[in-house]
Amino acid sequence: MNAPLMLSPESLAKIDKAVAKYPPDRKDSAVMAALTIAQDEKGWLATETMDFVAQYLGMPPVAVYEVATFYTMYNMKPVGKYKLTICTNLPCALQGATHAAEHLKKALGIGFNETTADGCFTLKEGECMGACGDAPVLLQNNKLMLCAMSPEKIDELIGKLKTEGAK
């Protein structure tokens, strides 16, 4: 295991806290929490990082890969500083998500699963986020849900994030 790919003591402490919620013989139950913590530190989940998580939790690497590749919240390659995920499922699409997604693509100059040349933004297409009544819904960095995202609100968000990103 390459030392630069291991997690910080702070991240390991967070994983240990998640593991403690489960019976001692079920450390693997904390795999989603461990992957999230690893991704928060590294920005994405390299194979080496997933291998480390598997070893730390005492589970086969393939089981970690299955979880990481199944859920859209995990980044399998480097992403921009701001990952914007827009729901394009039918309820959101019926409330303007398709138009909002096209506006995002045009405003950022990229398509889905692409990152801007400056490394600031990555655009993703996401599954239902459970806020259909507030569509179109956008998720920023898997943490902040933004609702009723009109083209005007999208432009405002992009401007704000560009300003923050330049700091």
Locations of regions flagged by a protein language model:
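Signature of N-terminal electron-transfer/Fe-S-associated modules in redox systems
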Residues: 1-167
